[in-house]
Regions:
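Hydrophobic N-terminal alpha-helices or hydrophobic patches in metabolic proteins across all domains
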Residues: 2-203
Length: 203
């Protein structure tokens, strides 16, 4: 008779308590599926996926978006993951995936609510808030369409342009600017995960 698998009771109610890794793969918890106008996010206090916002008509999420459990990014949330897969998943779905890189960026918020005190010299200290907001890029383990994608360089240049355009418009909806800092490889992505794990443990 086979032994029963050990389960973490907390993870059954809170997916953010699942392990971020399964062997050599990361475990991505989907929040918002590809093609969706609704932005969903996991509410840690209430233990449920909640609607955060609705994108304007004609604007949808270009890929499945989720997070890695037991991590903490610079923006105060678990580290974000953009997941490449054949068809959209659903909120709360656990998907094993392999990292291929990271999209590094920062969001810029004008705390004064206008341009007067923006980046001009002599403006009030703290008038502009910059926050790193990186997104890991991963490929689902179960995929046909993206099976040959092993690194970011395997993706067409148009993919990056469309991704950058989406985030510029997405952050603009909240009155924030988005600056793309660049793309880095799978090793850099893994380093980001380890740093986010360390931050979560020390919280």
């Amino acid at each position: 008779m086979s032994k029963k698998s050990k389960r973490n009771p907390a993870s059954l109610a809170d997916p953010s308590q699942l392990k971020p890794f399964a062997d050599d793969l990361v475990q991505v918890i989907i929040e918002t599926p590809k093609g969706c106008r609704n932005k969903y996010a996991y509410d840690h206090e209430q233990g449920i996926f909640a609607l955060r916002k609705v994108l304007p008509e004609g604007m949808v999420f270009p890929h499945d978006f989720g997070f890695l459990p037991q991590t903490l990014a610079d923006d105060g949330d678990p580290i974000d993951v953009l997941l490449l897969m054949d068809v959209p998943a659903f909120s709360g779905c656990l998907i094993p995936a392999r990292l291929i890189g990271v999209m590094e960026g920062e969001q810029i918020e004008d705390l004064q609510g206008g341009k007067k005190n923006g980046n001009k010299k002599g403006g009030k200290k703290g008038a502009v808030k910059k926050t790193r907001n990186d997104r890991l890029i991963a490929v689902a383990q179960a995929t046909h369409q993206f099976a040959d994608i092993q690194k970011l360089g395997d993706l067409p240049e148009q993919f990056r342009k469309e991704l950058e355009a989406f985030f510029v418009n997405y952050h603009g909806l909240e009155g924030k600017k988005y600056n793309l800092l660049g793309y880095r490889d799978a090793k850099a992505a893994m380093d980001s995960v380890k740093q986010a794990q360390k931050a979560a443990r020390s919280k």
